[in-house]
């Protein structure tokens, strides 16, 4: 069933850009991994939109982040407002329309698909099981061989041969 649902994404390869973050909690500490992930996804989505708008100046687009309802709704909306007004560590996110829109995933097939992408990413990074994840790799935002839509937050002292780190030549610190 999961494989069939993810195949729907793969069938629309040219029209879909995925964004995901895998966080090693120990490497992120003392930062909140949810907030760190949210900032990275916002930044990467904003950069994708900026790149797209530069390539297509007559078809400028803004992005809306739609998320599953959770206990993190209020804090993440506050962070999104802060990023638009004062910026994040990456600057202001000028290509996002407003704060994230939170919906019950039971009411949205797109959010259910996003949940499956998150699950596949979690299985890959937590259990080294790429059964679902590997078919998604070509769907992550990518330019010039670098996967921008997938970020792995980890200790730079550890070797890593995941798609995200290899595409940036970040197997080891200094490498």
Identify the role of each PLM range.
Residues 1-175:
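Phosphate-ester processing/binding pockets and catalytic centers
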